[in-house]
C-alpha cells in the first residue's frame, strides 16, 4: 500500500498518526487532487464511500457543482418511487409531439409517432441522457420542484433542480440553480441503490438502469477493471468545463463503493475532460485501498 493510500485512509477514518498534525494530513490527502486541478485548470469535487468499512475520501465534497444531466438518474429513481404507490405507472404510455424534441433526444425522436412508456422514457433518460425523455418525466412529477421535493423526502437537503432541459446547463459560476454537492449526490445514490429509499423491486430496476448506461465508458468506468460491475450516470453541460459522473462500483470480493466526481472551470469556453474525471476516480479508489486501474 502506497504512503498516499495509507494517509488518505487514515485521515478519512480519523485515526491518529504519530508525527503528523491534522493540517499536515489534510494537505497530504489534498495534494494529488490539487495537482489534478492545476493540470485541468478548474475545480474538482470528489466524495467516495466504502460501504463495507465506512471509510470516505473527500475533496471539495461540500461545494456546489452544476448537475448537468446527472439529475436524470435521480429523476428515474423518483419515478420508481412513485410507481410503488401508483400501480401500472411504468407501463403507462406517454404521447408527445415534435415540440417536445429538444436537442439530444436520440431515443425519443425515434418514437414520435408511437410514444413511449414511462419505463422506456426512464431508461432513455438514464442510459442515453435523452433530454426530451427527461422533460416528459419531469412534467409527470410536477417539474423541477417535484424532483427537488422527492430528494428532500429521502433526506437530501442540498440537491436543487430549478429549470428544464436545456436551460439547466448554463453552469454559470456562483449560480446555485440546478446544483448539488459531491457528498450529497453520493449519499443519495447510496440510499437509492443500496439502502431502503426504494423498495427492493424498484431498487433493483434503478440499479439495472444505471448498469446499462452507455455514456460513461471514459469516466468512472475507465478507472476500474473491466470485470467489475458499475452503474453510473454522467452529466455534461458543455460550458465552463462542467461535467460529472456518479457511480456504484462493485469490486470483486468486497463491499460496493459509491462515489461522485464533479468538475467546473472559470471560463465559459473551458473544455471538460473525461480523463480528469477518470483520474479523480482513480485517486479516490486508491484512497479507499481499492485496486482500480
Curated annotation (Swiss-Prot):
Query: What GO annotations for molecular function exist for this entry?
Result: beta-lactamase activity
Q: Which InterPro entries match?
A: Beta-lactam/transpept-like, Beta-lactam_cat, Beta-lactam_class-A
Q: Which residues are noted in the entry as a beta-lactam-binding? A: 69, 72, 104, 129, 131, 234, 236
Supply the alphabetized keyword list. Answer: Antibiotic resistance, Hydrolase, Plasmid, Signal
Q: Return the Pfam families for the record.
A: Beta-lactamase2
Q: What is its EC number?
A: 3.5.2.6
Active site residues of this protein = 69 (nucleophile), 167 (proton acceptor)
Annotated signal peptide: 1-24
Q: Which GO terms describe its biological process?
A: beta-lactam antibiotic catabolic process; response to antibiotic
How is activity regulated here? Answer: Not inhibited by EDTA, inhibited by clavulanic acid and tazobactam. Inhibited by cyclic boronates, including vaborbactam and bicyclic analogs of taniborbactam.
Reactions mediated catalytically: a beta-lactam + H2O = a substituted beta-amino acid
Q: Which family does it belong to?
A: Belongs to the class-A beta-lactamase family.
Give a short account of what the protein does.
Answer: Class A beta-lactamase which confers resistance to the beta-lactam antibiotics, including penicillins, cephalosporins and carbapenems. Acts via hydrolysis of the beta-lactam ring. Has penicillin-, cephalosporin- and carbapenem-hydrolyzing activities.
The further comment given in this record reads: Initially two different KPC beta-lactamases were identified from two different Klebsiella (KPC-1 and KPC-2); they were later shown to be identical. The class A beta-lactamase family has a specific amino-acid numbering system, sometimes called Ambler or ABL numbering and often misspelt as Amber. A multiple sequence alignment was used to derive a consensus sequence and then the consensus was numbered taking into account insertions and deletions. This allows use of identical numbers, e.g. for active site residues, despite differences in protein length. UniProt always uses natural numbering of residues, hence there appear to be differences in numbering between this entry and some papers.
Q: Which PANTHER family match?
A: BETA-LACTAMASE (PTHR35333), BETA-LACTAMASE-TYPE TRANSPEPTIDASE FOLD CONTAINING PROTEIN (PTHR35333:SF3)
Full protein name: Carbapenem-hydrolyzing beta-lactamase KPC-2
Q: Which organism is it from?
A: Klebsiella pneumoniae
- Organism lineage: Bacteria, Pseudomonadati, Pseudomonadota, Gammaproteobacteria, Enterobacterales
Amino acid at each position: 500500500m502506497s504512503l498516499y493510500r495509507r494517509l488518505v485512509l487514515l485521515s478519512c477514518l480519523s485515526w491518529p498518526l504519530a508525527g503528523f498534525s491534522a493540517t499536515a494530513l489534510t494537505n497530504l490527502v489534498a495534494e494529488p487532487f490539487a495537482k489534478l486541478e492545476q493540470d485541468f485548470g478548474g475545480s474538482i469535487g470528489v466524495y467516495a464511500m466504502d460501504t463495507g468499512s465506512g471509510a470516505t475520501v473527500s475533496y471539495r465534497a461540500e461545494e456546489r457543482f452544476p448537475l448537468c444531466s446527472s439529475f436524470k438518474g435521480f429523476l428515474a429513481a423518483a419515478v420508481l418511487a412513485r410507481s410503488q404507490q401508483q400501480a401500472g405507472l411504468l407501463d403507462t404510455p406517454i404521447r408527445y409531439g415534435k415540440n417536445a424534441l429538444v436537442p439530444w433526444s436520440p431515443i425519443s425522436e425515434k418514437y414520435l409517432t408511437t410514444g413511449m412508456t414511462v419505463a422506456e422514457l426512464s431508461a432513455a433518460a438514464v442510459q442515453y441522457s435523452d433530454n426530451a425523455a427527461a422533460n416528459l418525466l419531469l412534467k409527470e412529477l410536477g417539474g423541477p420542484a417535484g424532483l427537488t421535493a422527492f430528494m428532500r423526502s429521502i433526506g437530501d437537503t442540498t440537491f436543487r433542480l430549478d429549470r428544464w432541459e436545456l436551460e439547466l446547463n448554463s453552469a454559470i459560476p456562483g449560480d446555485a440553480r440546478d446544483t448539488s454537492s459531491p457528498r450529497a449526490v453520493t449519499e443519495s445514490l447510496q440510499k437509492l441503490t443500496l439502502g431502503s429509499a426504494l423498495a427492493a423491486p424498484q431498487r433493483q430496476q434503478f440499479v439495472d438502469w444505471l448498469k446499462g448506461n452507455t455514456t460513461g465508458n471514459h469516466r468512472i468506468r475507465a478507472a476500474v477493471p473491466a470485470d467489475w460491475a458499475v452503474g453510473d450516470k454522467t452529466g455534461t453541460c458543455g460550458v465552463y468545463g462542467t461535467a460529472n459522473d456518479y457511480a456504484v462500483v462493485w469490486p470483486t470480493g468486497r463491499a460496493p463503493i459509491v462515489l461522485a466526481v464533479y468538475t467546473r472551470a472559470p471560463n465559459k469556453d473551458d473544455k471538460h475532460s473525461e480523463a480528469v474525471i477518470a483520474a479523480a476516480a482513480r485517486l479516490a479508489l486508491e484512497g479507499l485501498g481499492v485496486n482500480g486501474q
